[in-house]
Design a protein with these regions (language model features):
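Duplex nucleic acid-engaging cores and interfaces of nucleic-acid transaction enzymes
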Residues: 1-188
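A short acidic Gly-Thr/Ser loop motif
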Residues: 190-194
């Protein structure tokens, strides 16, 4: 991803990689192959993923929409959108159930241009002959590889957070229930020896 100012135009550089035996018929084919490689490199870059992950956690929104016209217990979430940091655990779990049962379609949203700007800022070097090529590879990486992966990761993190909260709430509610006498107004004794 070195973008020197003196590097050749990407289309010119791609001419040297034309090889009909390998299925690379034109410079455009070679450039597409290079685009795929650069997109993979960007997608695998831990620093880029960390930046975009943090951006998604701060600015992302969860949206759920009804998949059909029928009424269900999930009607509250038929046209629902909430910032990720403000979602309550019970909302996440209900939305997940609604999606699993086929009543809801759920997506995690982040303004595409905001995500692409953060990616380009980390990668593109202004003035480089390859600048437009790198911008194109950034868009491909973001749309095809990075964002879908981050969306799945965000959903998984939300579900994990919601489940942990539900377990803690259950534990808090269970303790007093277990500590009360089994029969009200009667003393219960254990006579087992040992």
């Amino acid at each position: 991803l070195a973008q020197r100012r003196d590097c050749p135009d990407p289309m010119q550089a791609a001419q040297g990689f034309i090889d009909p035996e390998k299925g690379v018929e034109t410079a455009a084919d070679a450039l597409q192959g290079a685009n795929d490689i650069v997109a993979e490199l960007l997608s695998d870059d831990a620093a880029i993923r960390k930046t975009l992950r943090e951006l998604l956690r701060r600015q992302g929104r969860l949206r759920s929409l009804a998949t059909g016209e029928e009424d269900s217990v999930y009607r509250l979430y038929y046209d629902f959108e909430q910032p990720l940091p403000k979602l309550a655990g019970h909302q996440i779990l209900a939305i997940n159930r609604g999606e699993k049962e086929g009543f809801l379609s759920v997506t995690v949203l982040l303004d595409r241009e905001t995500g692409l700007t953060a990616l380009r800022r980390a990668v593109v070097k202004p003035g480089s002959a390859a600048m437009e090529f790198i911008k194109s590879a950034c868009e491909d990486a973001y749309d095809r590889l990075i964002y879908p992966s981050l969306e799945r990761e965000a959903r998984s993190d939300l579900t994990e957070r919601a489940c942990e909260g539900a377990i803690q709430t259950f534990a808090l509610n269970l303790k007093p229930l277990l500590m009360q006498p089994p029969v009200k107004g009667h003393v219960t004794m254990d006579t087992q020896n040992g």
